[in-house]
Amino acid sequence: MKKRNRLKKNEEFQKVFKKGQSMANRQFVIYQLDQPNQDELRLGLSVSKKIGNAVMRNRIKRLIRQVFLEEGHKLKQEKDYIVIARKPASELTFEETKKSLQHLFRKSAVYQQQPKKSS
């Protein structure tokens, strides 16, 4: 994931938290905010120290980034996303992480509409 596709600054995070919409399941919370003047999606990650040591937190962040790499082309691009990992996320494999995030993507309707094929 390129640096320009990441949320880094506290102000950027606060803007998404205050003005964005959230959706959650047991493992993750996703905040999303429309950014109409932006071409590509941006991703911010938050993994609390309560979840585990640095190795565990970095592993979770790598898994989330990989899911966004694989699914990113299907998501609405003109948005900022923040993913907050909850404690149960530390026990997930990559496939389970992907499934959990896909569930949230469907629930929050962030997949791009596919053009219907006409017969």
Curated annotation (Swiss-Prot):
One GO-annotated biological process of the protein: tRNA 5'-leader removal
Gene Ontology cellular component annotations, sorted alphabetically: ribonuclease P complex
Enzyme superclass (EC): hydrolase
GO MF terms held by the record: 3'-tRNA processing endoribonuclease activity; ribonuclease P activity; tRNA binding
A Pfam family it matches: Ribonuclease_P
EC number(s) reported in the record: 3.1.26.5
Keyword terms, alphabetized: Endonuclease, Hydrolase, Nuclease, RNA-binding, tRNA processing
Family: Belongs to the RnpA family.
NCBIfam families membership: rnpA
Task of the protein: RNaseP catalyzes the removal of the 5'-leader sequence from pre-tRNA to produce the mature 5'-terminus. It can also cleave other RNA substrates such as 4.5S RNA. The protein component plays an auxiliary but essential role in vivo by binding to the 5'-leader sequence and broadening the substrate specificity of the ribozyme.
Protein name: Ribonuclease P protein component
Gene: rnpA
